[in-house]
């Protein structure tokens, strides 16, 4: 990094902080400017089926509001057929008892982008994600997704 053999570099602030290099952080990219992939920044723990003891130990880290947001994000991703090759993202956050979500579908070359935001109740998280996907598909994102599948 110090040799300067690049025009620009974007690194995770969390990683730089862990390395004790926080003084090198020049700026942060907001989620308004760069919508992350679904589930970014959320920790998930998988346990054995029926392992009640482990479930009891880890229950304190479960946050129902965050879980609802992830449900919305996963529903969006499933509806658009998202994987690591699909230029789509969604960011859902809990806010005053409901979920605020923003999502996009873009072309691989970055020339086209469809972006929408939507609010919904936490109990309707999956429907919120699906609705965002349906709206973006109708806006023109569906054509991009079809091209990617060819």
Regions found by a protein language model. Name each.
Residues 2-150:
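Small-molecule-sensing regulatory modules
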């Amino acid at each position: 990094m110090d040799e300067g053999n690049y025009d620009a570099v974007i690194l995770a602030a969390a990683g730089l902080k862990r390395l004790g290099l926080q003084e090198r952080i020049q700026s942060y990219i907001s989620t308004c400017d760069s919508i992350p992939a679904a589930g970014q920044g959320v920790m998930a723990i998988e346990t054995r089926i029926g392992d009640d003891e482990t479930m009891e130990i880890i229950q304190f880290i479960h946050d129902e509001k965050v879980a609802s947001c992830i449900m919305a994000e996963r529903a969006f991703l499933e509806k658009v057929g998202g994987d690591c090759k699909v230029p789509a993202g969604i960011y859902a956050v809990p806010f005053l008892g409901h979920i605020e979500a923003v999502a996009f579908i873009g072309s691989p070359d970055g020339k086209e982008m469809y972006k929408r935001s939507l609010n919904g109740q936490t109990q309707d998280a999956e429907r919120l994600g699906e609705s965002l996907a349906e709206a973006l598909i109708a806006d023109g994102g569906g054509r991009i997704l079809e091209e990617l599948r060819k």
